Amino acid sequence: MGLLCAGPLMPYRQALLTDQPPKRILVLGGDVDRERAGLQLARQLRLPLVVTGGSNPEYAQWLMEKEGLSAGQVVLDYRAADTLENFTSLVDDLQGDGVEHVLLVTSEDHLPRALTVGSVVAGTRGIRLTGVPVACRTTCPQEGAGKQWSDGLRALAWVLTGQDLKPWARAQMQRLGQRP
């Protein structure tokens, strides 16, 4: 067990045990309320903010100005197309900047899945996530456990292989569906 904790699981152990204060705020885009909450938090805590997959740059710039943040305090990142890519596209940047603790801002219905995926991916770099839920405007149904598990498995596959296996799995399912 000691060898396992000293080997491949060491970054996860470091992430869980870190007592470092947050060094970055990460907003998973897709909802203006998330971005607004992240901007307000960045202003209050005076932390750098990364918005991944958010609204268009012009609107985001307007929101930044409205919240009194400088462009240098906010990074807009449009590389991600889904929750897994939100983390895989940024985790090396965060590690390179010496970030060990991130405040993760997303909608309350999305937070459990985002924390599952993010903890698997960011944990490989010794980065701990603390969730910051944003209330939905109207009632929002919680995402099912199946979605959380499937994305968690995708994240684990990414950790093991370095790639997202979703396109491969989709192609296999299509191939199986085309059999006579």
Q: Which residues are covered by each model-predicted region?
A:
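A structural signal for short, hydrophobic/glycine-enriched beta-strand patches
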Residues: 7-149
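A transmembrane-helix-recognition feature enriched in membrane-embedded lipid enzymes
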Residues: 141-172
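A general structural signal for short secondary-structure boundary/capping elements
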Residues: 72-76, 149-155, 174-180
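Helix-coil boundary and N-terminal low-complexity module in membrane systems
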Residues: 1-22, 36, 164-180
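Contiguous hydrophobic segments
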Residues: 107-122, 161-180
